[in-house]
Curated annotation (Swiss-Prot):
PROSITE patterns: SAM_MT_PRMT. InterPro entries: Arg_MeTrfase, PH-like_dom_sf, PRMT_dom, SAM-dependent_MTases_sf. The dimethylated protein is the major form. GO terms for biological process: chromatin remodeling; methylation; positive regulation of ecdysone receptor signaling pathway; positive regulation of transcription by RNA polymerase II; regulation of DNA-templated transcription. Homodimer. Interacts with EcR. Its main location: cytoplasm. This is Probable histone-arginine methyltransferase CARMER.
Length: 530
């Protein structure tokens, strides 16, 4: 995590206890061991003075001891937890029991000792479980924050040109909403959105980040010389305190199928810091749902499950697990992209209003479905994608993950039915999608579909936490049977047309390239080099 400058850390801690598990560093600390508790005799544990690096951790605060002369080498690492024994000794010293060591820390100043005492007290007097902790398994949270603590993962998102450029355009295109305003960046990651807010004229940005990425965000802030504008605060928005209300909240809280990772609840929770009539970027999200037909995808998953249908695999009968194998494969949502022509009806749109919806509204999301079928075929399941809108004072900007829009790192998601249903053009397909939040920062997705006027129905429950990432980078193929004329003749007609243009071009001094294109006449450059 980021280590704030001592003066900044003191200011934040004194003003409003910005983070209950503050991140800071202390230089010039002399560390002694208690050699004899009866006589209170001390011996220096390390040669010379040390620097203490305190960093946020889900269990408390990690205390790293490094030499003042060589900070690249960690001498010792301790964990300050709620049950850590500690006590003040005079004005500049602090006694603390860490692991098997009974230590006395003598700080360079009274202010440093007071700040360290506050760090310890904040850990020892942790608030009751936050909303985030109540809804999230500890193992899931640990894995989640570890994942987003990697620079490579931040790079993956930042290099999503559609995502990053749309955010920048939405913010800079509505500079009136940011000029001289106080901004909160929720789940800031590398801090890229905070930088966009500063580019738009923000007076102050509080960048909240709970993963180790906070330390890299702080480095970027300092190297770009905007530390007077951006304050990186390590911690969860559900647990930290801000010194003031904000005018705008910015965040990128969308997951697969919009709701995965349950970051949207954190985004809505952040509204407690939003001033009346404040702005949220993005402002609302639309989840689109449509029935699709894709025999290739269905067969692919079905055939995988048939591995367990072997009765003599190296002499072992696997068939008893075939049913469970089938269930497991069809519980996986498919993350990839597709040609929208596989969709059999216009998509149903479910809206999430980030300005007004409550966190509780996202615990159980029930979406009624009614599709008027446009083409006869086999419905293999439902396809999902989302759009979000940035409603600004100057302009509205949309970020889309539709199969008709440029591809993003969210792709699209498809949920298969183990038992597909045949449906005809003109029929009505009704049903419901139920998204039930779980403590693994995801949802259990239940699909129920029924053809009106018949007894035909199909259903499935999927685990959004465990998707199958199918995207390979290959071009999206058109659905079978969509060609209305001979593709071969169409191609040769195009070549013939191109050839006619080439002939005309050659008469006008152009050069044919590979027989199908026009090149620039470079003979002049070859004969008369500069």
């Amino acid at each position: 995590m980021s280590s704030l400058r001592p003066e900044e850390a003191r200011k934040l801690a004194t003003a409003a206890s910005v983070s209950p598990l503050s991140n800071c560093q202390f230089c010039g600390v002399v560390i002694s061991s208690i050699a004899d508790e009866q006589k209170l005799e001390f011996t220096n544990k390390y040669k010379g003075s040390c620097t203490l690096l305190c960093s946020y951790d889900s269990q408390g605060v990690v205390l790293r001891v490094v030499s003042d002369d060589d900070r690249s080498h960690v001498l010792k690492e301790y964990m300050i937890a709620a049950d850590t024994d500690a006590a003040q000794m005079g004005r500049r010293s602090y006694a603390v029991s860490l692991d098997a060591d009974n230590l006395v820390l003598r700080f360079a100043s009274e202010q440093d000792q007071q700040l360290f005492r506050k760090v310890v007290e904040n850990v020892k007097h942790l608030r009751p479980k936050s909303v985030f902790s109540q809804r999230t398994e500890e193992s899931s949270a640990s894995q989640y924050f570890q994942f987003y603590g990697y620079l490579s993962q931040q790079q993956n998102m930042m290099q999503d040109y559609v995502r990053t450029s749309t955010y920048q355009r939405a913010i800079l295109g509505n500079a009136v909403d940011f000029q001289d305003k106080i901004v909160l960046d929720v789940g800031a990651g590398s801090g890229i959105l905070s930088f966009f807010a500063v580019q738009a004229g923000a007076a102050k940005v509080y960048a909240i980040e709970a993963s180790n990425m906070a330390q890299y965000a702080q480095q970027l802030v300092e190297s770009n010389n905007v530390q007077h504008k951006i304050s990186v605060i390590p911690g969860k928005i559900e647990e930290i305190e801000l010194p003031e209300k904000v005018d705008v909240i910015i965040s990128e809280p969308m997951g697969y199928m919009l709701y995965n990772e349950r970051m949207l609840e954190t985004y809505l929770h952040a509204r407690k810091w939003l001033k009346p009539q404040g702005k949220m970027y993005p402002t609302h999200g639309d989840l689109h749902i449509a029935p699709f037909s894709d025999e290739s995808l269905y067969s692919e998953q079905y055939n995988k499950a048939n591995f367990w249908y072997q009765s003599a695999f190296h002499g072992v009968d696997l068939t008893t697990l075939h049913k469970e194998g089938m269930k497991e494969y069809f519980r996986q949502p498919i993350v990839d992209t597709f040609d929208i022509r596989i969709c059999m009806a216009k998509s149903v749109r479910h809206v999430c209003d980030f300005l007004n919806d409550k966190e509780d509204d996202l615990h159980l999301i029930s979406i009624p479905l009614e599709f008027h079928i446009l083409q006869t075929g086999i419905c293999h399941g439902l396809a999902f994608w989302f759009d979000v809108e940035f409603s600004g004072s100057s302009q509205n900007v949309w970020l889309s993950t539709s199969p008709t829009a440029p591809l993003t790192h969210w792709y699209q998601v498809r949920c298969l039915l183990p038992m597909p249903i045949f449906i005809k053009q003109g029929q009505t397909l009704t049903g419901r999608v139920l998204l039930e939040a779980n403590r693994r920062q995801s949802y259990d997705v239940t699909i129920d579909l029924h053809i009106e006027g018949t007894l035909i129905s199909s259903s499935n429950t999927l685990d959004l936490k465990n998707p199958y990432f199918r995207y390979t980078g290959a071009p999206v193929q058109a659905p079978p049977g969509t060609s209305t004329q001979s593709p071969s003749e169409q191609y040769w007609t195009q070549v013939d047309t191109q050839g006619s243009r080439n002939s005309s071009s050659m008469l006008n001094g152009g050069i044919s390239v590979n027989g199908i294109g026009e090149g620039m006449d470079i003979t002049h450059g070859l004969m008369h080099p500069h």
